Amino acid sequence: MVQVACGIDIGGSGVKGALVDLETGEYIGDQIRIPTPNPATPEAVATVCREVIDQLDVKIGVPIGVTFPAPVFNGVIPYMANLDQSWVNVDVDALMERYLGRAVVALNDADAAGIAEVAYGAAKGRDGVIVFTTQGTGIGSAIIVNGTLLTNTELGHLEIDGTDAEKNASSGQKTLQGLNWEQWAQRLQRYYSHVEFLLNPDLFVVGGGVSENHEKFMPLLKLKTPMIPAKLLNTAGIVGAAYYAAQNS
């Protein structure tokens, strides 16, 4: 059984990577971070990913997972918000294999964080339907059913009251609109009640920086489904990418 995998998390400002102990979900050694190139074209970002695995000295045969701030359908990105638009319709599996010299497993960054929370974090040992949401500028999401990830769910783009849910209920909008915790909680109530109605989940896990202040908003929500804060936070993307790559290589 594979004991070690590599996770690479591509973000708008930085490309981060680390080797992960698959038994514990912890980093082996230090994380590498290289600023995201500008412009963040596919070739430029792939070159940085190569630098990351070279600095980590990732051996041939070690699974590599790479996260993107976009959906990834069968290795192809249909649209891109946070990197260069030249990523649209790129076969990222083929691109990364060309630059890294080996196959990778590509996935959405929220999917990676969600599967990490189920494998090693707040939802470890929990069965049933787990809905993970990450709060930030928008709302990322992952749905895991009895340990199996349903990819590219994009629950932040559910239409609620005539607009994308994340345009009302993200923590980014809380900051932008100067909402207090009670005002924001009213919007969260509308959003999570809708998700609860659609999916009837067994557990909500909420990530993103705002989850560190969970005691200020979670008690204000009235949901049938239990809600808990994420545990892994800054390591979740890399850990989830590594775990998912090991499961799917």
Predicted segments, located by residue:
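ATP-binding/phosphotransfer module of carbohydrate and carboxylate kinases, centering on a glycine-rich
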Residues: M1-P63, V72-Y79, V92-V104, A116-V131, ...
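Glycine-rich nucleotide/cofactor/substrate-binding loop typically near the N-terminus or early
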Residues: F68
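Conserved phosphate-binding/catalytic loop of the ribokinase/pfkB sugar-kinase fold
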Residues: P78-V88
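Short loop/edge segments at beta-strand edges and connector loops
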Residues: A106-A110, G114
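Basic- and aromatic-lined ligand-binding clefts that recognize polyanionic substrates
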Residues: I139
